[in-house]
Amino acid sequence: MQQGIPVELSPSKVQEHIAAGEKFCMIDVREPWEFQTAAIAGSNLVPMGSVPNRLQELEAQADQSPLLVICHHGVRSLNVVQWLRHQGLENCTSLIGGIDQWSRDIDATVPRY
């Protein structure tokens, strides 16, 4: 992905990047029960409350590929991305509309709740 990754990306833009062979490290910041209800294949659960304690881990992952931060509707993920950027981790973006929008636009097999 180019330098200057946007703060937010739409599901269709994420899909375009993936189709072009680009990789994301997908970080789901929802609660465990939400993750069990619906998840994007390949995403990793890092509940929002645990993000500060896992900052070094997230920085290491962001060195490998951009972090795509996911939540239910895109609010928590945007807050996490803004916090990460404030900590100096710029290689991250929030999924606009969250997993709900992903289910509607990209993969209808992901349950909506």
Question: Which functions belong to the PLM regions below?
Answer:
Residues 70:
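Short, surface-exposed ligand- or partner-binding patches at beta-edge/loop junctions that are enriched
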Residues 1-25, 32-66, 75-113:
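Rhodanese-like catalytic fold shared by cysteine-dependent sulfurtransferases
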